[in-house]
Amino acid sequence: MHEMSLCEGIRGIVEDQARRHGFATVKVLRLEIGRFAGVEKAALGFAFDVVMRGSAAEGARLEILDLPGRALCYDCGEEAAIEDRFDPCPLCGGGRLMPVGGDEMRIKDMEVQ
């Protein structure tokens, strides 16, 4: 389950930010996760609760914000939202697409005290 290692990375970031900015507790942590990031959200939620024990984020509410998949169409030159990596261009029907968004995962923000 790679979600556990993702949460370990999040914990490291939280601990670093707590030292830098002097907060003791994270109340809410918001993650942006792209459609194509390959993250199982239920597993991430479980791993988050386990990995954050003993950290500033112990007991924090995890909010996940879904980011759409995006691709550049080489046929029409436009960028568009797509549901699946192998979808045709929703604008022109072309099949030559290069994904340009939706594979990211990042901390958007945290509510701290």
UniProtKB/Swiss-Prot annotation:
Answer whether the UniProt record assigns the keyword Zinc to this protein: yes
Q: Where does Zn(2+) bind?
A: 73, 76, 89, 92
Which biological process annotations from GO are given for this protein? protein maturation; protein modification process
- Give the GO molecular function terms: nickel cation binding; zinc ion binding
Query: Mind listing the UniProt keywords for this protein, alphabetically?
Result: Metal-binding, Nickel, Zinc
- Which chain regions cross the lipid bilayer? none
Q: Which domain of life is it from?
A: Bacteria
Alphabetized InterPro entries for the sequence: Hydgase_Ni_incorp_HypA/HybF_CS, HypA/HybF
Q: Where does Ni(2+) bind?
A: 2
Alphabetical list of Gene3D superfamilies matching this protein = 3.30.2320.80
Name the Pfam families for this protein: HypA (PF01155)
Sequence similarity: Belongs to the HypA/HybF family.
Could you tell me what this protein does? Involved in the maturation of [NiFe] hydrogenases. Required for nickel insertion into the metal center of the hydrogenase.
Q: Which PANTHER family match?
A: HYDROGENASE MATURATION FACTOR HYPA
Supply the name of the protein: Hydrogenase maturation factor HypA
The species this protein belongs to is Cereibacter sphaeroides (strain ATCC 17029 / ATH 2.4.9) (Rhodobacter sphaeroides)
